[in-house]
Amino acid sequence: MSHQSTINFIRFTFVILSLLAIYTILIPSIRKGFFQHITECEVTGKLSRSSGADARMIESFTGVPVLDIFVKALVTSFWPVINGENPALSLLGVPAVASMGVSYLLLLLEARRTRSLLSVTWRLAWVGLLQTNFSQAIILPIYCAIAFSSSKKTNGFRPIPHVTISLILCVYTGMALVALPSPAVIPDGLKQVVVAFMVPWALWVFVMVFMASYLFPIEVEKEKSRRTIYIFALVIAATTHLGALLASLLHADLGPADVFLPPLPWYVTRFPSLEEGMASFLQWDYLIASVTLFLWAVAVYLRDCDEHVDWQRFGLEVCAISVIISPAAMAVLLIWRLDEMLSRRGIAKED
């Protein structure tokens, strides 16, 4: 199979993955009661907890009623993930949020090759907002299909100053805070505020990168910057996935299937609780989004790689590593390998 045939197949797969996300996430959420459970919690103003008193929902997060509708819905839906009472959901929540930041970073690096820093961070800020408010599994395949079709074969890594520290402050610090037990360590109200702050995380990253680039301009060594960014992305993607995988293996009442494998839509007639609905939503979301990012990385690698690819070896290698360290981590490795190859090609041309 030629590179171009594989790339065309992957483009078609992006469309299928987005439709699959609608079928497995959006339609069941509407028809099988997940959104209804969210509405019921908003009406009562309480976030349920099986042990101890229910947490009271903050009535207004932004002061703008239209915005509060979206924020309250997201806080409510993520409550089973962050309240610590559902181990499977809590374990899956970490790599699911982490992979969103990793996919943002890889897409940003690819777009940055041919566009200005302001342009790519602004565009991806809106993509991030759509992913957070709807579903990463629905939005990411659509964006990858459009971005890949409109992009051209490129060469050369272009540094993005301050992006790693921006992601740490806007995404991963909040992720660590909501993972703390409540109300013993962190109050329920503060945990809700942190989730609300993280809703427009991609917009905060845009603001931080833009302001830092003008207030603290620095000369970045290309080789060091490339290594730092890819190591950061790889560590985030691999450690969060491996941590959840190992924890599920060591947990007495859980297994990897309980954490990562979503239920088939036709086997579920109705979600009996908010927790069940969120589990199905998040499992499908993480699975489809991770596969999308992996396929996008394969397509970019094959498009820009001039070397001959041994399909059997390549397929076995990437699939085996993806199972162990996650498809998102494998995507990082592929784009990193491609960048190293392009760098060597550029040096050879100069010589």
From Swiss-Prot:
Question: Which EC class heads this enzyme's classification?
Answer: isomerase
Give the pathway listed in the UniProt entry for this protein: Secondary metabolite biosynthesis
Describe its membrane topology: Multi-pass membrane protein
Q: Which GO terms describe its cellular component?
A: membrane
In short, the EC number is 5.4.99.-
Which GO MF terms does the UniProt record name? isomerase activity
Q: Signal peptide location in the record?
A: none
Asked if the keyword Ligase belongs to this entry, the reply reads: no
Q: Which residues cross the membrane?
A: 7-27, 62-82, 89-109, 126-146, 160-180, 193-213, 229-249, 281-301, 316-336
Localization per record: Membrane
What is the protein's given name? Answer: Terpene cyclase sdgD
Q: Which family does it belong to?
A: Belongs to the membrane-bound ascI terpene cyclase family.
The protein's role, per its UniProt record: Epoxide hydrolase; part of the gene cluster that mediates the biosynthesis of the polyenes aspernidgulenes. The carbon backbone of aspernidgulenes is synthesized by the HR-PKS sdgA, which accepts acetyl-CoA as the starter unit and performs malonyl-CoA extensions as well as regioselective methylation and reduction. The resulting nonaketide offloads the HR-PKS by intramolecular lactonization to yield the 5,6-dihydro-alpha-pyrone-containing hexaenoic acids preaspernidgulene A1 and A2. The FAD-dependent monooxygenase sdgC then installs the first epoxide on the penultimate double bond.
Keywords from UniProt, A to Z, are: Isomerase, Membrane, Transmembrane, Transmembrane helix
